[in-house]
């Protein structure tokens, strides 16, 4: 992994910092594991904007990722590491001994030619997947399930990881990177190691156009608008003299938005 600071040959290149990984596959992705994505532009079926700051961007195809890792007791070899435009983490194409190929999230330290395996009795090794009740305390894991068999939902982005800190008969306690401590069922699966490409956070896009390639449109401040457009709009100067709110008058910047009371009992300590 190399951090490259571009020379200031133009105003757009002056601040660009790239993260270059020479181990990434330079060819095309594995075609049978691709799906088309149609862009919504942030609109719903009525054509109304439901997600602001979305639109345009380069055409992409979705890579079908195996988050469940449920092909047990069949060894697989890492064929190549690839870039995925749909996530911050890199992905790995694995070839199972029975000839099937799947994409997985590429863990840190996993290289081409390495062997991985899933199952209840898999060895404790980076890239292997097994029920979290069979993983030693203190281990670092990623791609953790919340419901058994549903597929990994926690710690899937670049550099993400979770630590196992306690275990009882039916549940395992995890410490998330956010500081939250929560319990999940001991039959849930997790993959050993942390997600690779942690240097993703060091990149600097350098220009607005790089965000537009990623379908991200500009974010206009409420204080820069007129009163008809935003509660913060209008007035002399930049002060709006009230608690920050959304364009629809809902409190923002610190207001709690979580509303899933059924799973509150599994959160031992909220994130700080």
Swiss-Prot record:
Compositionally biased tracts (Basic and acidic residues): 261-272
Any single Gene Ontology cellular-component annotation: large ribosomal subunit
A GO molecular-function annotation: transferase activity
Biased segments, Basic residues type: 250-259
Biological-process GO terms, alphabetical: cytoplasmic translation
Pfam families for the chain: Ribosomal_L2, Ribosomal_L2_C
Keywords of the record: Ribonucleoprotein, Ribosomal protein, RNA-binding, rRNA-binding
Span list, region Disordered: 222-272
InterPro entries the UniProt entry points to: NA-bd_OB-fold, Rib_uL2_dom2, Ribosomal_uL2, Ribosomal_uL2_bac/org-type, Ribosomal_uL2_C, Ribosomal_uL2_CS, Ribosomal_uL2_dom3, Ribosomal_uL2_RNA-bd_dom
PROSITE patterns from the UniProt entry: RIBOSOMAL_L2
Family: Belongs to the universal ribosomal protein uL2 family.
Function noted in UniProt: One of the primary rRNA binding proteins. Required for association of the 30S and 50S subunits to form the 70S ribosome, for tRNA binding and peptide bond formation. It has been suggested to have peptidyltransferase activity; this is somewhat controversial. Makes several contacts with the 16S rRNA in the 70S ribosome.
Record note on quaternary structure: Part of the 50S ribosomal subunit. Forms a bridge to the 30S subunit in the 70S ribosome.
Protein name as catalogued: Large ribosomal subunit protein uL2
């Amino acid at each position: 992994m190399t951090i490259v600071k571009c020379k200031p040959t133009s105003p757009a290149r002056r601040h660009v910092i790239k993260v270059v990984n020479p181990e990434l596959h330079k060819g095309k992705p594995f075609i049978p594991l691709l799906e088309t994505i149609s862009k919504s532009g942030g609109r719903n079926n009525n054509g109304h904007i439901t997600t602001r700051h979305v639109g345009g961007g380069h055409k992409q195809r979705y890579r079908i990722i195996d988050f469940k890792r449920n092909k047990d007791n069949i060894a697989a070899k890492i064929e190549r590491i690839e870039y995925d435009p749909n996530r911050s983490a890199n992905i790995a194409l694995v070839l199972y001994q029975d000839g099937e190929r799947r994409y997985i999230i590429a863990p840190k330290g996993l290289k081409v030619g390495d062997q991985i395996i899933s199952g209840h009795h898999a060895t404790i090794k980076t890239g292997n997947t097994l029920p979290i009740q069979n993983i030693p305390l203190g281990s670092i894991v990623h791609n953790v399930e919340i419901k058994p068999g549903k597929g990994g939902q926690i710690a899937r982005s670049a550099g993400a990881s979770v630590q196992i800190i306690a275990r009882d008969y039916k549940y395992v306690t995890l410490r998330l990177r956010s500081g939250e401590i929560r319990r999940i069922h001991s039959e849930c699966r997790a993959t050993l190691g942390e997600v690779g490409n942690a240097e993703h956070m060091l990149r600097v896009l350098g220009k607005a156009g790089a965000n537009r390639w990623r379908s991200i449109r500009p974010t206009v401040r409420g204080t820069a608008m007129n009163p008809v457009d935003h509660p913060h709009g209008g007035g002399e100067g930049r002060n709006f003299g009230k608690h920050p709110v959304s364009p629809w008058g809902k409190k923002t910047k610190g207001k709690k938005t979580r509303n899933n009371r059924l799973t509150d009992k599994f959160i031992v300590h909220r994130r700080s």
